[in-house]
């Protein structure tokens, strides 16, 4: 190899250039690192791949090839191993097969969905993705189904009638000719298709490497940016320069329209790989499958047509299918603004799935119809839920929201929805979804094109860019005119200055007098513009908008207080239909951004779960903020498990409440588009309805309140003493994450079964007020008591014997789950989906967790350590709502 002949200095210098990825100087022989090919079995590859003898800068970071002992080439995508069946570098395609699905489908050890990174891979048009639903209800009948020991009953039908009766799902890629729609799935055909694999196309701009090769350079990568390395001197100097498009090249590329799938003549803000400068980052197109699609918040929208300033889109999963698997509501409006805005004719069609009542229970209503999924237990509403036209239907809408498992809002054409209202049938509903909705380009693109420029995106300013030929746009002025009339122009200018001088005094006086008026007008215009924007955002939220006067009226001038918290006061209220509501009036919000409040309420409004408190409306009027949500007559769990409670709940009821809270937290962590971490789970934030069904409340409110200080003190730390996770206090225990909610849940469960004693906590608090003790005394109590004989007594303590075997099993299960959840290290705690599985599963499957090693933390260091732990936490996939919760002294 080349490196044997290199001097030590050259080797070190070249390695330095490899690892730092900078324009570098190295040995000319160093180019051999990228000239060598990757070879394994019958696979040979060069740029843009790397691996083996080809070092990392020689290829794209995501295209590392591996060769195992059997000479099989593999590639890892999102930690999933794929075998490389074939590489065709002429067409830039690969054939891949998942290594875990090469054998018997039922014996696979993992069933995970691996998403192909769209920035580098594009599924070939001759292949498609299918969803496999598993752990389905064996009592129901499914199309294209099979039963495996590990999967239970599973189905591959793409128009599943009972999609919500299956607990899990994952996707596989198969040829478009594969149709699993028969009654019983032919597993042999499926296994054969998976073994053959699927084809993907590499999404890499070929021009930079072609230009580099024309200069006898070596193609390489500086991170994800293509570079070209060339020898600069006979003595061996090498220079690696990142590729940059010239201004003329950008203008040429962006002034031309492009095609994607079946769509032609596409332009800004849409773009595809190779045209990054020509479109907005949020509008990258996926051209696989023969369609032009954009992905917003994990939801695909298909481009139906585009003409200059208008673009028509439709939800891809709803085209031709009213019952897609696991549909989501995409908060795409925030992504589109300010590049695109909805046209005035667009309405939001809301679809409800998995409802617990029949259509006969819904009174006749022109705005509400039957969807036709889930054996008829699914419905649609043809108007924005905030529309005044639906005021007379609030009772029906409340039932839909509370008794349906999922609701999805889909933009649709107003005229199409009007046709659906006048002639409600499945064909018109499909037509309304298939026709999509229109959006208007709001940027300066039309002006740019009119001046001869090409529309694009300026990476430096992160905004709209107008690219011009030779750097000039607009009309060219005729300099000859000025030469011919130079004397006349000079005279005109001289007399103009004289006239201006005479008027200067008068102008100054008028300006002084008019400035205050101008300031008022500008302020009013700006305020009007902001209000219009807020009104547009409000209109997109499927909740009732209340004025402050209406809030005051429904609460009878805020007379009946039902609760107080760190964010505001809760009042009971009554709507016009006599239904009871709870109204939380947030603390003074002067100086805060109303748009932030609207965006947060929008996120909160998209949660829909039986164990999550339902939001009914909101008020955003100046600095006044209020949240209106369902009223739960039984109040909080705290009054049922506190020492002062006169009502004792049996263990079965407590178990049902604990399981419901776990399911609610699982939904917040995994069921929402963006993970929601509560950070303040405690009995006061668990509300109970008339049937003692628990509902988690007060999530998302902290971000809606003003942050008073830049550095949080101990009393400003998220959570409540006694429930707060150790890592929230000190980084010694790990990073802050969704596992902090798991800890709080564990403490809640232990309190519910009486494993926590208020007097013990009070003693610890009084013994050393300057320190925070985590409850290791729980284990001491459990050592004294026999776990298998736990019983909840009247005062919440632990005694032995005298309980039924069923209650004994419940107590043991809740104790073990609680102890697993309060492990001091976040990595030792189970995630909430595992907690639900443990609570629902067999007691025999649970092991006694290890006793955590807990340390005494000085309160004086809490503030600094808290911030350190937060900064180190992985927050990229977490929407941290509780940013300013008060650390309250709870009565435990």
Swiss-Prot record:
Residues 28-496 are extracellular. It comes from the Eukaryota. Pfam families: GUB_WAK_bind, PK_Tyr_Ser-Thr, WAK_assoc. It catalyses: L-seryl-[protein] + ATP = O-phospho-L-seryl-[protein] + ADP + H(+); L-threonyl-[protein] + ATP = O-phospho-L-threonyl-[protein] + ADP + H(+). Residues 518-892 are cytoplasmic. Residues 556-854 form the Protein kinase domain. It is a single-pass type I membrane protein. ATP binds at residues 562-570, 584. Its main location: membrane. It is found in: Membrane. The modification Phosphothreonine is found at residues 547, 717, 720. GO terms for cellular component: membrane. Glycans are attached at residues 42, 71, 88, 112, 186, 222, 230, 286, 358, 384, 407, 458. GO terms for molecular function: ATP binding; polysaccharide binding; protein serine kinase activity; protein serine/threonine kinase activity. The keyword Nucleotide-binding applies. The chain crosses the membrane at residues 497-517. InterPro entries: Kinase-like_dom_sf, LRK10/LRL21-25-like, Prot_kinase_dom, Protein_kinase_ATP_BS, Ser-Thr/Tyr_kinase_cat_dom, Ser/Thr_kinase_AS, WAK_assoc_C, WAK_GUB. The active site is at residue 680. Keywords: ATP-binding, Glycoprotein, Kinase, Membrane, Nucleotide-binding, Phosphoprotein, Receptor, Serine/threonine-protein kinase, Signal, Transferase, Transmembrane, Transmembrane helix. Its EC number is 2.7.11.1. The modification Phosphotyrosine is found at residue 629. Residues 1-27 form the signal peptide. It is an enzyme of class 2 (transferase). Belongs to the protein kinase superfamily. Ser/Thr protein kinase family. This is LEAF RUST 10 DISEASE-RESISTANCE LOCUS RECEPTOR-LIKE PROTEIN KINASE-like 2.8. It comes from Arabidopsis thaliana (Mouse-ear cress).
